[in-house]
Amino acid sequence: MFWVTFLETMRILKPGGLFYLNAPSNGGFHRCPVDCWRFWPDAGHALVTWAKYNNLDVALLESYIAHDENGGNDFVSVFVKDESYAQKMTDRIIDNYSNYYNGKKYGSDQILNNHHMLNKIV
């Protein structure tokens, strides 16, 4: 049901509107070839792909796992409706926040502060 809720949220935003998503995220991260059913780095890209498949113009501005010493890590992501606005929105949370891992920024496939990357299925 979340995937449908995501589509509806993006549909009702005005062009240039932002959607901030914060969801619990724990467990090992693996790619085989992607890990998008849990809230890990591939999840943001998978949601954008799903939105585009459903004729919505969406871009992922950034995503990361906020590190919590007590183990309650959160997946944080920011989406924009209408990708043409992505170039105009240059401020990123992770540019001013260091307590994160597995970060991604718009326009790059690089994973920042890569952590818990396993080469096998967990």
Predicted segments, located by residue:
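Core SAM-dependent methyltransferase catalytic element
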Residues: 68-122
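Conserved Class I S-adenosyl-L-methionine
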Residues: 32-57
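Active-site rim elements
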Residues: 30-35, 62-66
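A structural signal for well-ordered alpha-helical segments within the folded catalytic domains
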Residues: 3, 7, 41-46, 73
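Conserved S-adenosyl-L-methionine
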Residues: 53-69
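Conserved SAM-binding loop
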Residues: 1-29
